[in-house]
Design a protein with these regions (language model features):
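Conserved N-terminal subdomain of the carbohydrate kinase-like
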Residues: 1-116, 263-278
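Buried hydrophobic packing segments
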Residues: 20-23, 220-227, 240, 244
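Generic secondary-structure signature for well-ordered alpha-helical cores
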Residues: 29, 63-71, 96, 100, ...
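Conserved phosphate/ATP/ADP-binding segment of small-molecule kinases
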Residues: 120-200, 231-234
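Short, small-residue alpha-helix embedded
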Residues: 147-148, 210-237
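Charged C-terminal helix
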Residues: 234-281
Length: 281
């Protein structure tokens, strides 16, 4: 069985598919990467070249997978940074194909819209992202994205949980808040939270002063792997949080400007410190 991963790809660096594909393969998964955007490196470094993959090319690649019968063994679709609104239609078609071809196929939507109070996608992508979140089985927003998708204020732990419930009511059975520092989050830490039905968990992790590119992409991939393995949301939260934190810790030590994913790959299946989530509902 395979995972179709539809998101950005870099020539150098580890965000989007450049992070997710390797992580999933290292964890033993077959992955089919479909790039929405091809860039030389992360735009935050300046001078990035490349751009969105033409929609007709994405469509033809998807059709090629269909002709090979690929969706009869596609257990999950993972989507991230779209780069253009039209790519949302490709994702929607892929999800429909996977669900038709493989009963029980799962769709995880990482709704990449922005962070730290600002968008880094065009406004034309916001509405299609609402639609994708509504058809997802699992959605993994950061705090900013949760606020956008739910329309709720996300400033405290209780507000975050309420916003997750609002978003859940619009479609996705599982909502995972990938990073949150609220007014009541303990100092020098961050929260990762998950909601599955009425059950909720919170994982409090030591924070970092360094900003990382690709941390959310890595978390979403590892969470999907862990969830597929056990179908246990609380356990998947602990595994994904622990593995991602371990990689970030390895990256922060030398203050590297890209995730040291290759150097720390051994931490993905076996992080040195395992954090356990707290059941909060």
């Amino acid at each position: 069985m395979a995972i179709l991963s539809i998101q950005s790809q870099l020539a150098a660096g580890y965000v989007g598919n450049s992070a997710a594909v390797f992580a999933l393969q290292r964890l033993g998964r077959e992955v089919w990467p479909l790039p929405t955007v091809l860039l030389s490196h992360h735009p935050a470094h300046g001078g990035s070249q490349g751009g969105p993959v033409p929609v007709h090319l994405l469509t033809s690649m998807l059709d090629g997978l269909v002709s090979r019968g690929g969706f009869e063994r596609c257990e999950a679709v993972l989507s991230g940074y779209l780069g253009q609104a039209e790519a949302a239609d490709i994702v929607g078609r892929a999800v429909a194909r996977a669900r038709a071809g493989t009963p029980g196929a799962v769709y995880l939507c990482d709704p990449v819209l922005g962070d730290d109070g600002r968008f880094y996608v065009g406004q034309d992508i916001v509405t299609p992202m609402h639609a994708l979140a509504a058809i997802a089985d699992i959605v993994t927003p950061n705090a900013f994205e949760l606020g956008v998708l739910s329309g709720e204020t996300v400033a405290t732990r209780q507000q975050a949980l309420q916003a997750m419930r609002v978003l859940q009511a619009r479609g996705p059975g599982i909502v995972v808040l990938t990073s949150f520092i609220g007014a009541d989050t303990p100092p020098a830490t961050l929260d990762v939270m998950a909601l599955d039905g009425a059950a909720a968990w919170r994982l409090n992790l030591p924070g970092f002063t360094q900003k990382f590119h690709g941390a959310g992409d890595l978390f979403a991939a590892v969470f999907l792997d862990a969830w597929l393995a056990q179908r246990d949301t609380g356990a998947a939260l602990g595994k994904a949080g622990s593995a991602t934190h371990a990689v970030l810790g390895a990256t922060a030590l030398p203050a590297a400007d890209e995730l040291l994913l290759i150097e720390s790959q051994h931490l993905l299946p076996a992080p040195t410190v395992v954090f356990s989530p707290e059941r909060i509902a």
